[in-house]
Structures are given as structure tokens and as C-alpha cells.
């Protein structure tokens, strides 16, 4: 793996200014970012995007680019069908995320479909997920953006928690690609080697995180076997990007 594959990430900079985050990336010599639209850095919802011009100027000044854009679900749910208000606003939000990624010169949109309901039919919610992701892929393709989907943890959702479910989704929505997040993969008992064996070049980004049963951590604050995970990642022929949350 090359050093340039390891990209900076603002995931743990939610309570720091954009300047503080970008200054840190410059010191670490990170020229590419996995960027989350955190309110302190970029405001983004289904109605508007605020701060894009400021962000773009700040990135250009430091010669930093965005390699992947990671919108969080917040109050939106890809498990809602487009016949409901929440479902329509969700679709609008993710389309705006595509627009924002394209405006930043970023061709990879990574989504984490959290928020399935426990007391609603899993079959219905799965159909809604397929509809939403397929529609988003079609829209993103028009803007030169690739949609990538990751699994989520038990605390985040009752669906799409395993590699098996993700494989099913990618079979039903072949235009989508994958993100490997070590936290939900670990909770599901899945290895990095297993993921690459199943998905290969479909994996476009790796969120290489430490964690505990209650979620992700900066490396050293969780319980995951760093050396084992690192060795597995080095063994696979992966040329995509890797984000280390907290860097």
C-alpha cells in the first residue's frame, strides 16, 4: 500500500473549525480527504448547502482535494419509500449530496444506510432501500459520481448489517459499489480478507477504524487487532483509498 492511499478524514473534527482541520491535514501531508458534511465545516440538507464556496477556496489554497464524500443519514432514511414526505426529502438530500460532491471535484459518494425501523416489515423497507439506492445511482451517473454503500452496526439499523445483505443489494442495484467499514464488519464477525474475496474491485473505499461494541474509535481507544487488520489489508491487491478516522 502506498502512502498516498491513506487520506485525511474530518470524522473526529466535528467540534473543531474547518481551518483547524485543514491545518492538521497539511501538517500530516495529506493531500486528499474523505470528507463528511459536518455542520462546523459544511451545512448540507435537502433544501440547501451552505459553506461550499468557503470550503472550496480553503481546499484550493492548501492544494487539498476530496477523494470521497460521506453524507450521514441524520433524520433521513433510505428505508423510506418515495411516496412519503421523509422518503422524498431523503431522495432530495442525497441528490444534493451528489451535486456537492461533483462541485468539489469528487467522484465517489459513500453512504451508510442507517435507521431502518424495528416495527415495520423488513421486506417493505428492503424494497424502499433498493428503490432509493437505484434512483440515487441513476442520478449520480449523470454527474460522474459513483455511489458506494457500506454496512452498518446493530445500533444503527436492523437491516444491511452484514456482507451477505450488501452482496444482495449490489446484485439488485449493480450500478452501486461498496465501502468496507471495519466497525460493522467486525461486529458481524467478518474479516477484511473475506470482504475482498467477495467484492474485490467493487470496494472503492476502506474506513479503517478501531472500535468497541458501542461504535467506532480512534485507533488505540478501541479493542480491534490493529496489526491483524493491517496485515490483511496489505495482503489484498487494493489500490483505493483508506481513511483513518481521527487523523
What spans do the regions from the language model cover?
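Active-site-proximal flexible loops/turns
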Residues: 17, 41-43, 75-77, 119, ...
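Histidine-acidic metal/acid-base catalytic patches
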Residues: 1-7, 15-29, 60, 105, ...
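Residues at or immediately flanking beta-strands
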Residues: 32, 65, 144-148, 177, ...
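Non-cysteine beta-strand/loop elements that form the S-adenosyl-L-methionine
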Residues: 31-36, 67-71, 111, 200-211
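Alpha-helix initiation/capping motif
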Residues: 45-48, 83, 122, 159, ...
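N-terminal pre-domain/capping segments
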Residues: 1-106, 175-177
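Active-site acidic/histidine proton-transfer and metal-coordination neighborhood
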Residues: 20, 61, 78-177, 187
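Active-site beta-loop-alpha junctions enriched in small/polar residues
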Residues: 9-14, 36-40, 71-74, 114-116, ...
Amino acid at each position: 500500500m502506498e502512502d498516498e492511499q491513506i487520506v485525511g478524514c474530518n470524522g473526529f473534527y466535528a467540534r473543531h473549525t474547518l481551518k483547524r482541520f485543514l491545518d492538521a491535514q497539511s501538517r500530516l501531508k495529506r493531500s486528499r480527504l474523505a470528507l463528511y458534511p459536518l455542520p462546523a465545516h459544511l451545512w448540507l440538507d435537502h433544501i440547501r448547502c451552505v459553506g461550499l464556496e468557503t470550503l472550496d477556496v480553503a481546499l484550493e489554497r492548501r492544494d487539498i482535494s476530496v477523494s470521497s464524500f460521506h453524507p450521514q443519514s441524520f433524520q433521513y432514511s433510505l428505508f423510506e419509500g418515495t411516496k412519503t414526505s421523509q422518503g422524498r426529502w431523503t431522495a432530495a438530500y442525497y441528490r444534493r449530496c451528489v451535486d456537492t460532491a461533483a462541485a468539489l471535484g469528487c467522484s465517489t459518494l459513500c453512504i451508510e444506510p442507517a435507521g431502518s425501523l424495528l416495527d415495520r416489515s423488513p421486506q417493505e423497507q428492503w424494497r424502499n432501500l433498493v428503490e432509493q439506492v437505484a434512483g440515487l445511482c441513476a442520478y449520480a451517473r449523470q454527474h460522474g459520481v459513483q455511489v458506494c454503500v457500506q454496512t452498518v452496526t446493530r445500533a444503527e439499523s436492523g437491516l444491511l448489517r452484514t456482507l451477505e445483505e450488501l452482496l444482495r443489494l449490489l446484485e439488485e442495484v449493480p450500478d452501486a459499489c461498496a465501502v468496507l467499514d471495519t466497525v460493522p464488519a467486525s461486529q458481524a464477525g467478518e474479516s477484511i480478507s473475506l470482504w475482498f474475496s467477495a467484492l474485490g474491485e467493487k470496494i472503492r473505499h476502506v474506513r479503517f477504524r478501531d472500535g468497541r461494541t458501542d461504535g467506532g474509535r480512534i485507533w488505540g481507544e478501541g479493542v480491534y487487532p490493529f496489526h491483524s487488520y493491517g496485515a490483511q489489508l496489505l495482503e489484498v491487491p487494493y489500490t483505493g483509498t483508506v481513511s483513518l478516522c481521527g487523523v
